[in-house]
């Protein structure tokens, strides 16, 4: 993962990385808003402050960047081992992955439906991501209707 950036350039790049209102979040939020869905963003009342929360349906959505959330970790990790500061990055991303699992378990335990999208999927297939969300809403409504009929 060698690059041609100086330490100062690398530092500046890293400082410019946002943790909320990222491009991938904005793209997905705009698509949901245009379909009439209203949501909370970075909802602090829930574990992990999910990027998008559809409180009406008890759905949380995380928009995960590939690097920081360790997509294809079995490929990325060996590449990171060759990089400067490899111990830091491997530890950081490993912990992010663990935290993602912990938060997801906690949210599921609290009765929330958790959806995760990779950033590139949001950017390349926004409509498909929205469709996944809409299908999840449909499934939840069907479950709700089924429970009402049983009672």
Which role fits each region the language model picked out?
Residues 1-116, 120-151:
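Nucleic-acid endo/exonuclease domains
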């Amino acid at each position: 993962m060698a690059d041609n950036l100086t330490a100062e350039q690398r530092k500046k790049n890293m400082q410019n990385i946002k943790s909320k209102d990222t491009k991938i979040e904005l793209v997905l939020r705009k698509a949901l808003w245009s379909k009439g869905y209203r949501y909370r963003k970075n909802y602090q009342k829930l574990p992990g402050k999910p990027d998008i929360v559809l409180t009406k349906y008890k759905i949380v959505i995380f928009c995960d960047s590939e690097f920081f959330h360790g997509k294809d970790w079995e490929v990325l990790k060996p590449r990171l081992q060759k990089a400067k500061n490899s111990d830091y990055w491997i530890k950081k991303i490993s912990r992010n992955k663990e935290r993602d699992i912990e938060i997801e378990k906690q949210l599921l335990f609290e009765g929330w439906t958790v959806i995760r999208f990779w950033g590139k999927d949001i950017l390349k297939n926004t409509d498909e991501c929205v469709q996944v969300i809409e299908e999840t809403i449909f499934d939840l409504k069907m479950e709700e209707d089924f429970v009402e009929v049983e009672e």
